[in-house]
């Protein structure tokens, strides 16, 4: 197996005390956020569950700032997601109850990749992002922890893989420091998410 399973993601979130408002892990049919007055988060796969999934992304709703965060470790644009995975954020937003609000919603999404396409760590990066969301309210992207990651233009074949590879070291160090579940399952989690799992460069 490569990547991170739904069960592993839930254990990691629990070990980091990030379960408040967490709706669960979903496949591409995620219905969106349905309670606009509550903090809500989710980790969503761009593929269907019955086919094993494809790629994890994280989503979060902050009712105080009226912000919806969308985090894709590979930084794909909407058009690229549609082309590569047949997945659309816009379709999910239309299903969400948030659009029924009279207030304007701010949608923030990363525009750079932080994960190399040779890596299977998209799920781990999603958990890392949700940690930033909870710890730095209103500044899920603009904080010292998230900004410690190198960003690169989204590409199937990164021009400078080494800078993204450094992010994986930062990621593992973070989990070793913060998550008892990761420490107890370190060998397996690293083996299933390591660099070079996918031949992209």
From Swiss-Prot:
Cleaves viral precursor proteins (pTP, pIIIa, pVI, pVII, pVIII, and pX) inside newly assembled particles giving rise to mature virions. Protease complexed to its cofactor slides along the viral DNA to specifically locate and cleave the viral precursors. Mature virions have a weakened organization compared to the unmature virions, thereby facilitating subsequent uncoating. Without maturation, the particle lacks infectivity and is unable to uncoat. Late in adenovirus infection, in the cytoplasm, may participate in the cytoskeleton destruction. Cleaves host cell cytoskeletal keratins K7 and K18. GO terms for biological process: proteolysis. Keywords: Autocatalytic cleavage, Disulfide bond, DNA-binding, Host nucleus, Hydrolase, Late protein, Protease, Thiol protease, Virion. Requires DNA and protease cofactor for maximal activation. Inside nascent virions, becomes partially activated by binding to the viral DNA, allowing it to cleave the cofactor that binds to the protease and fully activates it. Actin, like the viral protease cofactor, seems to act as a cofactor in the cleavage of cytokeratin 18 and of actin itself. Its EC number is 3.4.22.39. GO terms for molecular function: cysteine-type endopeptidase activity; DNA binding. The keyword Protease applies. The record marks 52-53 as: Cleavage. InterPro entries: Papain-like_cys_pep_sf, Peptidase_C5. GO terms for cellular component: host cell nucleus; virion component. It is found in: Virion; Host nucleus. All late proteins expressed from the major late promoter are produced by alternative splicing and alternative polyadenylation of the same gene giving rise to non-overlapping ORFs. A leader sequence is present in the N-terminus of all these mRNAs and is recognized by the viral shutoff protein to provide expression although conventional translation via ribosome scanning from the cap has been shut off in the host cell. The active site is at 55, 72, 122. This is Protease. Interacts with protease cofactor pVI-C; this interaction is necessary for protease activation. The lineage of its organism: Viruses, Varidnaviria, Bamfordvirae, Preplasmiviricota, Tectiliviricetes. It catalyses: Cleaves proteins of the adenovirus and its host cell at two consensus sites: -Yaa-Xaa-Gly-Gly-|-Xaa- and -Yaa-Xaa-Gly-Xaa-|-Gly- (in which Yaa is Met, Ile or Leu, and Xaa is any amino acid).
């Amino acid at each position: 197996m490569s990547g991170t399973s739904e069960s592993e993601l839930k254990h990691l979130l629990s070990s980091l005390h990030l379960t408040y408002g967490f709706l669960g892990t979903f496949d591409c049919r995620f219905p969106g956020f349905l309670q606009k007055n509550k903090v809500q988060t989710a980790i969503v796969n761009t593929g269907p569950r019955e086919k094993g999934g494809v790629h994890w992304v994280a989503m979060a709703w902050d009712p105080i700032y009226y912000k919806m965060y969308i985090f894709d470790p590979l930084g794909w644009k909407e058009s690229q997601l549609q082309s590569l995975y047949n997945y659309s954020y816009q379709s999910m937003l239309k299903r969400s109850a948030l659009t029924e609000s009279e207030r304007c919603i701010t949608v923030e999404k990363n525009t750079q990749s932080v994960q190399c396409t040779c890596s299977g760590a998209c799920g781990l990066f999603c958990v890392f992002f949700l940690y930033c969301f909870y710890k730095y309210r209103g500044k899920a992207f603009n904080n010292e922890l998230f900004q410690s990651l190198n960003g690169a233009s989204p590409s199937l074949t990164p021009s400078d893989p080494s800078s993204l590879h450094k992010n994986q070291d930062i990621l593992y160090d973070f989990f070793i420091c913060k998550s008892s579940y990761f420490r107890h399952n370190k060998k397996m989690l690293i083996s299933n998410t390591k660099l070079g799992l996918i031949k992209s460069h």
